[in-house]
Amino acid sequence: MTRMAYEYATYEKKGRIAVVTVNRPERMNALHPPANFELDAIWNDFERDAAVWVGILTGTGDKAFSAGNDLRFTAEHGRDMIRMADSGFGGLTNRTQCWKPIIAAVNGYALGGGFEMALACDIIIAADHARLGLPEPRVGLMAGAGGVHRLPRVIPQKIAMGYILTGRHMTAQEAHRLGVVNEVVPLAQLMTTALGWAEEILACAPLSIRASKQAVMMGLGQPLDVALKLGFTEAERMRRSEDTVEGPRAFAEKRKPNWKAR
């Protein structure tokens, strides 16, 4: 296991899995500009590292995944200090070309930018006490880091508008019922469950996973007949890979495949 310590986050590589933990519990894991830029650097490394195939994002403690933008910092330093990298809030919300899968392990409040980071992930596992929401209008802001765009793509528009226009929170159970969250578990089982999902993904060919994610994301919003005809770079990379030979061979030989991501 490789562990890299940052001031506002921790970054661990456990075999093929990277675990990113926001580490500002004294501020409910809310992010200020230095934390945003640290997370940008971490996700840049995650994308570049060929040895890492799945990411997990969580927060320190049992109270908050992330409470979003650090409003106290903003109040002290002014709104012009709301800065982040081009990759968006937490280095993630604008990172639309990352084809490696990322799992959000929501360990408490995921509000504002915190919820937007979770929505930018591919799978969300929530602790049973978690609450999620986009309360930005209640403090004179809007969910501009993707929340107003992603939530209506996940749940029906009218229901999404109800949350966006009121700033209401949804419980983990409500989020699961609406299809925002994949699974709800007790807090003590959260990371074990997230790691279990990651291991299940790792049982699949990594290039197949990336090709599938790219096709899903680039096909969203397209008419079906258009989406079916789109060409995808990750699919072409998959077709030319050793793994497309290894998969059928392992099946025929009744053994587990040895994926190489090449």
Indicate where each model-derived feature is located.
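Crotonase-fold acyl-CoA enzyme core
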Residues: 96-209, 232, 240-241, 245-249, ...
